[in-house]
Amino acid sequence: MTTAPLERVRLRFTLLDTDANGYVEADDFERLAIRIIKAVAEPVSSPKALAVLEGHRRYWRGLVDDLGADHDGRVALHEYVTHVARPERFDDVIREYAESLALLLDVDDDGFIEHAHFLACMRAVGFHPASVDALFAELDPYGAGKVAVRAWVASIKDFYGSQRTDIPAQRLLAVPSVG
């Protein structure tokens, strides 16, 4: 894995490790999902919120199933790096995760995500506002103030699975996250 994709992997791990204990665990995924749901003021019991929770849970199960040889219920950075080096093994998991996030943020179900919801979600994850704004601008080339759901889903999938450095989500590494 080259430097830029490895930086993305490390950043993802840091953001997923919501309690900063050096491991990613099931509770981290629950905390992250709840933070995102609350950030966009969605009722936790709504279908969209439940889909986000399930997307995070499925991501966790896919991760631990792939790396669960030691059955300790947690994933260290070196294990995470091993897992993500094979993105094809979890493409469906990431797609579901990405779609659930995008549909949550499409609050009026018009196929687009407005900047305020995008920023709220990405801040809840832990990204720096300047990086989020740079990514949003990349995904909104006409300055309409909104991003197509399908464009953001593709960007999330690239962030998790691509080895390329010319992807829009690479902008998220421009400024350190705010943890």
Q: What residue spans do the PLM features occupy?
A:
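A short, hydrophobic/aromatic-rich structural module that often spans a beta strand
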Residues: 79-101, 135
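Acidic/histidine-enriched, glycine/proline-rich intrinsically disordered or flexible terminal extensions
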Residues: 158-179
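Short, intrinsically disordered linker segments that flank or connect zinc-binding domains
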Residues: 1, 48-49
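Conserved aromatic-histidine-acidic binding/catalytic patches
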Residues: 1, 21, 120, 124, ...
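Amphipathic regulatory helices of Ca2+-sensor modules
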Residues: 25-46, 74-89, 112-126, 148-162
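Short helix-capping and inter-helix turn/linker motifs at the boundaries of alpha-helical repeat units
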Residues: 1-4, 54-55, 92-93, 125-127
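The feature marks the first
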Residues: 2-41
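Primarily EF-hand calcium-binding motifs
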Residues: 5-21, 50-72, 96-110, 131-150, ...
